[in-house]
């Protein structure tokens, strides 16, 4: 039977999940000094065959991760990761076991928060309107300065609660990822409240999430 993979964790604790993707049973098993979580999907086409089905399945997938995150730190598989059977899953884990083992130890007892910054005045610009090279460079420098200002403020106010920051640009927004020990959650939220408004920027916080952006060590990520 095809398997849909959720995540791997430390071998203990084992988290019992009532319902998984497509209302299936969530199975967990210890293997290779890890614990894997998955569901058997008898008919992937009916479960994931159209946009609405995929949307519902994604909600259920994230609900499973949230329940696991409440008790331990999951290292998620990209949704949807479907494998042919348990033998194929074992082979995948064996192929990446060192990465997974390192990740579950390094990220043990951590959470991830995300902050997305947008600049409303910039979003109202007409991307189709031609601009000169000088104007383009000016706008680019202004955008970099805006990002740098937010970056500096976030890191300054949260220095005592965040273990590591990562970020990436997106179309008309910039996204930051904060990795923090589970016990620093309230302190982190409180520190953001002290930051005050960022001029011209709108910030949106979400989380906590599994620390998926930090699975690869920084030296390999950069």
Question: Locations of the language-model features?
Answer:
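An interfacial alpha-helical scaffold signature
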Residues: 1-222
């Amino acid at each position: 039977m095809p398997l849909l993979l959720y995540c791997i964790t430390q071998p203990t604790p084992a988290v019992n999940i009532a319902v998984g993707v497509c209302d299936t049973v969530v199975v967990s098993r210890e293997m290779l000094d890890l614990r894997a979580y998955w569901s058997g999907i008898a008919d992937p086409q009916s479960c994931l065959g159209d946009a609405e089905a995929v949307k519902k399945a994604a909600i259920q997938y994230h609900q499973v991760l949230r329940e696991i995150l409440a008790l331990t730190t999951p290292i998620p598989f990209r949704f949807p990761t479907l494998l042919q059977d348990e033998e194929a899953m074992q082979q995948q884990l064996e192929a990446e076991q060192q990465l997974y083992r390192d990740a579950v130890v390094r990220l043990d007892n951590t959470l991830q928060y995300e902050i997305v910054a947008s600049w409303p005045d910039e979003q109202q610009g007409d991307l189709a309107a031609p601009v000169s090279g000088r104007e383009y460079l000016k706008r680019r420098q202004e955008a970099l300065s805006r990002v740098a200002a937010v970056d500096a403020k976030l890191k300054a106010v949260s220095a005592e609660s965040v273990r590591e920051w990562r970020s990436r640009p997106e179309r008309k927004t910039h996204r930051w990822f904060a990795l923090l020990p589970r016990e620093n959650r309230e302190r982190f939220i409180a520190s953001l409240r002290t930051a005050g408004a960022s001029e011209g920027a709108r910030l949106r916080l979400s989380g906590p999430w599994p620390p998926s952006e930090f699975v690869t060590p920084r030296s390999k990520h950069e």
